[in-house]
């Protein structure tokens, strides 16, 4: 068995191994540039299985990891189309799970995800979902489930926690715990500058108007929600990912 050896990777990358364990990597075209070992556990998967990656250069294009924490797990489908996706973990986080597209025909994502202090947060993003610009905050053991075939516009804010505690002034008891998972179900359209707060849940085939603040749980499908706080303003509707022009000229 070799004690110290080098493995060549594509694009000029070299990894030095000691007793079978990777020590560090560098670019043979620019030896001053060393590659960082990932602090999180990252798995790339497809229908044939998954494999773990260990260095930042192995990440899919335009996906960036930052922060600290321990034992956080990220699963990324190999067909994911990403644009400037940044996942940041607070130094006090642990045991968080992030799934970016669970199978083939994957989403197109342009977003920033921040895991605040806390443990066992869960983020799940389904298939055929497009996010054009969103900031997502998770914390305190919360969960966000974003379903299949969704469209999210620009400047979307989703927070599964308030972040700071609100207490009863007499007893000191914290009164703003999140109670339920935050759920955006299948085939939902979130308009420009939608804000989704903790405990918010919307069912399949929901349209959310620009600037709406989603709070609480909605149960009726095929609706339009608008306002602050959001309320149902129209029923019996659906939407298409095609433009009006495209549909009128089929």
Where would I find each of the regions flagged by the language model?
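Amphipathic helical hotspot of TIR/SEFIR-family domains
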Residues: 207
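Conserved metal-binding segment of the jelly-roll/cupin
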Residues: 211
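Domain-scale signature associated with acetyltransferase and cell-envelope carbohydrate enzymes
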Residues: 1-160, 179-187, 194-199, 204, ...
């Amino acid at each position: 068995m070799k004690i110290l050896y080098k493995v060549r990777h594509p694009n000029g990358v070299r990894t030095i191994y000691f007793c079978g364990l990777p020590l560090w990597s560098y670019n043979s075209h620019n030896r001053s540039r060393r590659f960082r070992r990932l602090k999180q556990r990252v798995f790339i998967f497809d229908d044939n299985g998954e494999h773990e990656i260990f260095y930042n250069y192995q990440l899919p294009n335009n996906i960036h990891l930052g922060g600290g924490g321990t034992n956080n797990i990220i699963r990324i489908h190999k067909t994911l189309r990403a644009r400037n996706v940044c996942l940041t973990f607070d130094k006090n986080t642990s045991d968080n799970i992030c799934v970016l597209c669970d199978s083939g025909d994957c989403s197109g994502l342009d977003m920033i995800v921040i895991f605040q202090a806390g443990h066992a947060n869960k983020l799940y993003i389904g298939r055929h979902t497009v996010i054009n610009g969103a900031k997502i905050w998770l914390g305190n053991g919360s969960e966000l489930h974003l379903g299949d075939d969704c469209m999210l516009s620009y400047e979307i804010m989703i927070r599964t926690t308030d972040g700071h505690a609100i207490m009863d002034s007499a007893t000191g008891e914290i009164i703003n715990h999140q109670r339920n998972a935050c759920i955006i179900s299948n085939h939902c359209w979130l308009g420009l500058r939608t804000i989704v707060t903790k405990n918010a849940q919307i069912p399949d085939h929901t349209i959310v108007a620009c600037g709406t603040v989603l709070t609480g749980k909605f149960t009726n499908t095929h609706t339009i929600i608008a306002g602050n706080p959001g309320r149902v303003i129209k029923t019996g509707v659906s939407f298409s990912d095609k433009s009006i022009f495209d549909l009128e000229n089929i």
